[in-house]
């Protein structure tokens, strides 16, 4: 059955003029998660031979750019860069094409050349996906979307957590067009975070006011953080528990006596 399904998508790709059966994976990802919307600017990393570029252009109708170490044969309405996504020179070329505001969507369907050693192949897949995430963080617009392929294994959950640390909503998804025996899975990140802090960060802050909900409200690098169970005038060590596009939540790890309290105690 798996072989039949694989052959079905292979023949469908040929019939519909796609360069790769992987084109159907992106179609199914988008049907499920709405990663690409009409008019979006899209950057596909590791884009050769171009199957995802064809679908991205159909879905978006806007600016679509493919980047790969290999040359990508021309696709009407699609721009390409031959370069390494880890190189700053490539990042600059991408930004020059998509604009300083960045891309709406970054995709990566790249996979390592398989060696037959699963642990090694899994590690290489995570390395590629990490490079894609680092590139995405440099070229995505605020609230932009991200989709990347990884192989499941020991390092998968750590990578998933890293994506969660940079996007509001994150899902793992296996499209029907993937082989049933394949360990590949796609991670979808929605609404890229551009906050100056991340979940798990720690700060010492003075609570100067309460928000409408009764939580403490502090500014960290101009970003609003709501702190539970505090009073105005308290000095506390907090840990960021959740980050949203425009604000974050934090829990108190330690209550610290203010210098004013210490001085009062000394005078007593």
UniProtKB/Swiss-Prot annotation:
This protein's UniProt keywords: Cytoplasm, Methyltransferase, rRNA processing, S-adenosyl-L-methionine, Transferase
Signal peptide positions (record): none
Active site: 149
Gene Ontology CC terms, in alphabetical order: cytoplasm
Gene3D superfamilies reported in the protein's UniProt record: Nucleic acid-binding proteins, Vaccinia Virus protein VP39
Gene Ontology molecular functions: rRNA (uridine-2'-O-)-methyltransferase activity
Cross-referenced SUPFAM superfamilies: Nucleic acid-binding proteins (SSF50249), S-adenosyl-L-methionine-dependent methyltransferases (SSF53335)
UniProt EC number: 2.1.1.166
Reactions this protein catalyses: uridine(2552) in 23S rRNA + S-adenosyl-L-methionine = 2'-O-methyluridine(2552) in 23S rRNA + S-adenosyl-L-homocysteine + H(+)
Domain of life: Archaea
Domain TRAM, residue spans: 196-254
Intracellular or extracellular location(s): Cytoplasm
Keyword Cytoplasm: yes
Binding annotation for S-adenosyl-L-methionine: 50, 52, 68, 84, 109
Family: Belongs to the class I-like SAM-binding methyltransferase superfamily. RNA methyltransferase RlmE family.
Function, in words: Specifically methylates the uridine in position 2552 of 23S rRNA at the 2'-O position of the ribose in the fully assembled 50S ribosomal subunit.
Protein name: Ribosomal RNA large subunit methyltransferase E
Organism: Methanosarcina mazei (strain ATCC BAA-159 / DSM 3647 / Goe1 / Go1 / JCM 11833 / OCM 88)
Chain's gene name: rlmE
